[in-house]
């Protein structure tokens, strides 16, 4: 029986810092290895690569196959090789990882079973897509000399704050039970557009449905999964509010979508506070059809970086000409027009550190046995400092 070979997860792991707020990984060669999927059976090797892996320009995979960079069952394949059940397909590629924030992964607590961290915004948790070494898991393994870790809770790449990792599958299962327990209390802070109600707790019980998985788009929908969040305003600075968020369920993008639905989206959220996608209402009360929202979001994703392009118009004093110049500059930041001299891959420009996160932070997790908390991020403290009536966060 064919087996996928083991690999050193930190092979070629090297970090470069230039003092510009970014952590970089120099390009390196990497062997992508996978078992054939059921939907691949009976298709040619070239057909599989052209339909399943679209991160390369047209013609790249045919050239890679003809150059011997693609193997089937450890044998060099050709464009007409038919994929069958049990086949192992590999691709030797020059890998270019996107830069991430250079902020360190803070250790909140560590014992023989768990590591509790303060995750920086803009860093994915585990290898996915174009990210491999520029992930929380590999950073912990490389810089903190941690052995193999198992994530126990999930934070989006753009979100910062508390995360739990176990050091064994057994400990991971024990923590998983904690995480789904209704006795577990979670607290987040978010900085949102506008003056959030100051009338005590605001509860949102709107159900959530993933309407476009490839775009990461979730919306309020009657056929969605049950979701419940308790919100409370902490401070208001005249433009934005700092809101304490207590999720009672754990749905994808729950806090981001509930805040948008209430009319107070996270101020720099590239999806749910984007006027080009949602229009002037920014999706309040679920306004906008799925079809129109998906179409606009898809178009923006093809031409622009995942950044809150228009969100600051309510917050800055820039002229219309300055705003247009800023937008035009962003339009060219996705691809530079240059190519790697070694592999021909189109090169992306670097994001600014501000584009690597949103104003959403996992602040505190508490069970009957333990309690862990991080410091408030600077963007949250900034709001509190501007409001003399800001409430304390216990």
Swiss-Prot record:
What does this protein do, in the record's words? Pseudouridine synthase that catalyzes pseudouridylation of RNAs.
Q: Which InterPro entries match?
A: PsdUridine_synth_cat_dom_sf (IPR020103), PsdUridine_synth_RluA-like_CS (IPR006224), PsdUridine_synth_RluC/D (IPR006225), PsdUridine_synth_RsuA/RluA (IPR006145), RluA_PseudoU_synthase (IPR050188)
Q: Which reaction does it catalyse?
A: a uridine in RNA = a pseudouridine in RNA
Q: Which GO terms describe its biological process?
A: enzyme-directed rRNA pseudouridine synthesis; tRNA pseudouridine synthesis
Q: What CDD domains would the database entry show?
A: PseudoU_synth_ScRIB2
Enzyme Commission no: 5.4.99.-
What UniProt keywords are attached to this protein's entry?
Answer: Isomerase
What residues sit in the active site? Answer: 156
Task: Give the family, as the similarity comment puts it.
Answer: Belongs to the pseudouridine synthase RluA family.
Q: What class of enzyme is it?
A: isomerase
Task: From the Swiss-Prot or TrEMBL record, give the protein name.
Answer: Pseudouridylate synthase C18B11.02c
Q: Which GO terms describe its cellular component?
A: cytosol; mitochondrion; nucleus
Pfam families referenced in this protein's UniProt entry, alphabetically: PseudoU_synth_2
An annotated Gene Ontology molecular function: RNA binding
């Amino acid at each position: 029986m064919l087996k996928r070979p083991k690999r050193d997860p930190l092979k070629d792991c090297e970090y470069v810092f230039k003092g510009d707020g970014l952590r970089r990984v120099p390009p390196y060669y990497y062997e992508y290895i996978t078992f054939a999927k059921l939907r691949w059976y009976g298709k040619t090797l070239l057909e599989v690569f052209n339909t399943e892996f679209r991160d390369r320009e047209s013609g790249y995979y045919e050239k890679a196959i003809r150059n011997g960079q693609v193997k089937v069952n450890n044998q060099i394949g050709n464009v007409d090789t038919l994929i069958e059940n049990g086949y192992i397909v590999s691709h030797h590629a020059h890998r270019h990882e996107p830069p991430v924030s250079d902020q360190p992964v803070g250790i909140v607590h560590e014992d023989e079973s768990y590591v509790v961290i303060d995750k920086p915004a803009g860093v994915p948790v585990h290898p996915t897509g174009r990210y491999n070494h520029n992930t929380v898991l590999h950073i912990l393994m490389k810089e903190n000399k941690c052995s193999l870790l198992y994530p126990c809770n999930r934070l989006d790449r753009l979100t910062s704050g508390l995360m739990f990792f176990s050091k064994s599958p057994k400990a991971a299962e024990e923590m998983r039970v904690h995480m789904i327990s209704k006795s577990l209390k979670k607290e987040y802070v978010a900085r949102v557009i506008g003056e959030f109600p100051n009338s005590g707790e605001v509860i949102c019980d709107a159900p959530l449905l993933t309407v476009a998985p490839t775009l990461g788009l979730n919306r309020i929908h009657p056929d969605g999964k049950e979701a419940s969040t308790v919100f409370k305003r902490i401070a208001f600075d005249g433009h934005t509010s700092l809101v304490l968020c207590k999720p009672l369920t754990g749905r994808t993008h729950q806090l981001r979508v509930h805040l948008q639905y209430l009319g107070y989206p996270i101020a720099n959220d590239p999806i749910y506070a984007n006027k080009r996608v949602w229009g002037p209402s920014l999706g309040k009360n679920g306004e906008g059809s799925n079809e129109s929202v998906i179409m606009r979001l898809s178009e923006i994703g093809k031409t622009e970086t995942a950044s809150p392009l228009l969100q600051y118009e309510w917050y800055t004093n820039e002229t219309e000409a300055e705003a247009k110049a800023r937008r035009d500059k962003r339009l060219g930041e996705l691809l530079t027009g240059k190519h790697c001299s070694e592999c021909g891959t189109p090169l992306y420009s670097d994001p600014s550190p501000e584009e690597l996160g949103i104003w959403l932070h996992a602040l505190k997790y508490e069970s009957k046995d333990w309690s862990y908390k991080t410091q408030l991020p600077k963007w949250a403290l900034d709001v509190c400092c501007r409001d003399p009536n800001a409430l304390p966060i216990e």
